[in-house]
Amino acid sequence: MSEQSKCPVTGRTAGHPVAGGGMSNRDWWPNQLPLDMLHQHSSLVNPMGEAFRYKEEFKKLDLGAVKKDLYALMTDSQEWWPADYGHYGGLFIRMAWHSAGTYRTSDGRGGGGTGNQRFAPLNSWPDNANLDKARRLLWPIKQKYGKMLSWADLMILAGNCALESMGFRTFGFGGGRVDIWEPEEDIYWGKEVEWLGSNRYSGERDLENPLAAVQMGLIYVNPEGPDGNPDPVAAGRDIRETFARMAMNDEETVALVAGGHTFGKCHGVGDPNLIGPEPEAAPIEEQGLGWKSGYGSGKGDETMTSGLEGAWTPDPIHWDMGYLGMLFKYEWELTKSPAGAWQWKPKDVAEEDLAPAAHDPSKRVPTMMTTADLAMRMDPIYGPISRRYYEHPDQFADAFARAWFKLTHRDMGPKSRYLGAEVPAEDLIWQDPVPAVDHELITEGEIAELKMRILASGLPIPELVSTAWASASTFRGSDKRGGANGARIRLAPQKEWEVNQPEQLQRVLHELEKIRDTFNGEQSGGKRVSLADLIVLGGCAAVEEAARRAGHDVTVPFAPGRTDASQAETDVESFAALEPLADGFRNYAKRKYSVTPEEMLIDRSQLLTLTAPEMTVLVGGLRVLGINFRQSPHGVFTRHPETLTNDFFVNLLDMGTEWKPVSHEHDTFEGRDRKTGEPSWSATRVDLIFGSNARLRAIAEVYGSDDAQEKFVHDFVAAWDKVMNLDRFDLS
């Protein structure tokens, strides 16, 4: 075999000679742009069909009947995987927690909103060991209710029912999570190449963004302590960083840990080397189950999971104050589990504080705490909070109920998306509430009149388009946050973001507010227009005018109905996570990053739920409309600015231009006429990628063709309309 026929990175040669086998393009060229993540979860992989609407099916569901079935399941112990203490509650709480607990605030990805625990890599993470059994236990219920109940909803609901069946009163439940049917390829879980690797820190323990978990394959932190070092104070620092990146403050963190660990037990009774492969690596006859243990029967009291062993409380299947009671009642001594994991045992434990053996109630065994648990007492911030909860059980119960609800619903977006009879009435700040529409909406005639007023105001096309884009493009399809509804672009922190060019933004908002106030003052009835609507309408009017200048009479769709949120309804710290580090659509980067600008464009496009053609046509259109950050000339490949032409593509593809880098980092470029040597254009990597990448060039060639101008305008308007309405869940 010649060296040329081997992969230059892995050294591998072609594998099985079947369709889809052999070396992939990414094996040969590992730095390929990940465009495939823009085309995930299409109708081609979804067996439900394009007409399926889960929201309508869920409305048919008898939620009470489902919960009754789940309550019955909790104590219906199965021989193939018997329930600890005769109750599956602890297992289902862990399943729901680990489904929701992958969420991180930085990019909104992860979480329990898609049922992704069914697929790799999550279904095979070490921290999810034996949760495959929990999902198999749920299958008869999923089978019974079919398309009316998604796996994503069922897993979270099972966690709620587990808590309720053990005496805890939950805060509520909102359905509406839609299942995916293939693994998510857009989520960066880390660069480690082995399970439990921790090559994600720099400096004195600076965790890489956007990650939240401390090691590959863990949901949160290492329960034995940082990198297995049993130091509770150091563990507290890891816990604080990780939970903060998952949207939890200190009080919520303590409530979740103490509340969740009131139930169930850990499993580490034998040799961890006897545990078989995870589901994705297990043999076909295991039928998707993994971690088959060769220690004894491999189940019941001989179960192996985390390597830790024991319950936290003397009564692991009832809600009580046992966790905090044990935490403060005893001093704790470092020991090792039978599997060799670091854990802590209570000194001189009283008989009444022993727990029953999980599968033999006649036996009593000691409880345990992990290093992470002891951080709830020994950390200087967590300790006083834990003590207060211990002394005030009602506060603790309320805090846990609210934190659990937040954990399991944080990635669902606004409350308007929640379904079912158990949705709490209370609005919560982390839900990014916007006021309900309490006025008559503007008519088509009034929309046309307002467009004329906006264009007559003297506000230039680039500023109107830029403001509308800045408002709407904060949306993240990952956790359904952001968007134009609420007009939060006028509030902190968005009004101060560099990318939004605050001085220009305030000038535009001031003019739009005057138009709004004048219009609303002219109305004799209850009709009004919100600033949120007017911001989007201004962008639409500007796009129409730019198209008219190019010779195209188009109407950009507009649907009124947005309202204006207040600063009190806006969590400044939470919204800070939505600030763009880079926005290739505006040719903006806050600073230089370890990833390329074109990769960040793909990332942002994926969050905006854009396809590669939509991304391409938007970049080309926005360049000629002139919305670049600080009016940069990069990528403005036109002699007719503020006119909606396909000039970006025509000039990018012109072989009469030769491009050369003008920066050492190869991030800015100059295009010169091949014959005269005269400079023609300047560009960034985000601009040139549409001529460099073969797949993007193929799309660019469509829009750069002589007959493409009308198609370009049509497609740009459609993609623009999509972005403007991404958060209009009332329209979908």
UniProtKB/Swiss-Prot annotation:
Site location (Transition state stabilizer): 94
PROSITE patterns noted in UniProt: PEROXIDASE_1 (PS00435), PEROXIDASE_2 (PS00436), PEROXIDASE_4 (PS50873)
Residues engaged in binding heme b: 261
SUPFAM superfamilies, per the entry: Heme-dependent peroxidases
Cross-link Tryptophyl-tyrosyl-methioninium (Trp-Tyr) (with M-246) per UniProt, renumbered positions: 97-220
Keywords noted in UniProt: Heme, Hydrogen peroxide, Iron, Metal-binding, Oxidoreductase, Peroxidase
Gene Ontology MF, one: catalase activity
Cross-link (Tryptophyl-tyrosyl-methioninium (Tyr-Met) (with W-97)): 220-246
Enzyme class: oxidoreductase
Cofactor: heme b
Cofactor: record remark: Binds 1 heme b (iron(II)-protoporphyrin IX) group per dimer.
Listed GO biological process terms: cellular response to hydrogen peroxide; hydrogen peroxide catabolic process
S-S bonds: none
Annotated stretches, region: Disordered: 1-23
InterPro entries: Catalase_peroxidase, Haem_peroxidase, Haem_peroxidase_sf, Peroxidases_AS, Peroxidases_heam-ligand_BS
Top-rank taxon, per record: Bacteria
GO cellular component labels: cytosol
Post-translational modification, as annotated: Formation of the three residue Trp-Tyr-Met cross-link is important for the catalase, but not the peroxidase activity of the enzyme.
Claim: Membrane is one of the keywords in the record: no
Role according to the record: Bifunctional enzyme with both catalase and broad-spectrum peroxidase activity.
Subunit relationships: Homodimer or homotetramer.
Protein name according to UniProt: Catalase-peroxidase
Organism for this UniProt entry: Chlorobium limicola (strain DSM 245 / NBRC 103803 / 6330)
Gene: katG
